[in-house]
């Protein structure tokens, strides 16, 4: 459990993770200390010196033991007990981070669901965020297309497609034009 706990601590010290994201990373085999990143375990090594079969069997048994679901569950529980892991905190920080990069509600919600955060926590995090999504959509459009937004339908359609891709709702996109007219 100590190896998995140290992996979890290292991962959580770099950035917040959702529970399912951390669980997935802990279940995956760790990178080799020899620098065998991305190589399959069954692939033949190009090294001229063969590794010791006793060491490789020991490493395989440790990898099986380390990816044991009970060990992972204990590590996850330990992280919750020490307040290192919190899906609500993760969702709030993720929303703030992605909104600063110019993404809208739909895109952020989709990404959070892919990371395994449940809908209730996502909704609560959006309700607690104090982000003006209409203003953000306007800032993103002005950053991409210019300070004065286009008025021709072809150019407006381009702005709309871009903002939809970024995850903004149609109402937020329409509001940037109604605000600029007034």
Curated annotation (Swiss-Prot):
Gene3D superfamilies hit by this protein: Winged helix-like DNA-binding domain superfamily/Winged helix DNA-binding domain
Role according to the record: Modulates RecA activity.
Protein name per the record: Regulatory protein RecX
GO CC terms in record: cytoplasm
One GO-annotated biological process of the protein: regulation of DNA repair
Protein family according to the UniProt entry: Belongs to the RecX family.
Keyword flag Transmembrane: no
Swiss-Prot/TrEMBL keywords: Cytoplasm
Superkingdom, taxonomy of origin: Bacteria
Record keyword Cytoplasm present: yes
InterPro entries: RecX_HTH_2nd, RecX_HTH_3rd, Regulatory_RecX, WH-like_DNA-bd_sf
Span list, region Disordered: 12-54
Bias type Basic and acidic residues, positions: 13-24
NCBIfam families the record matches: PRK00117.1-3
Subcellular location: Cytoplasm
Residue stretches of biased makeup (Polar residues): 43-54
Major subcellular location class: cytoplasm
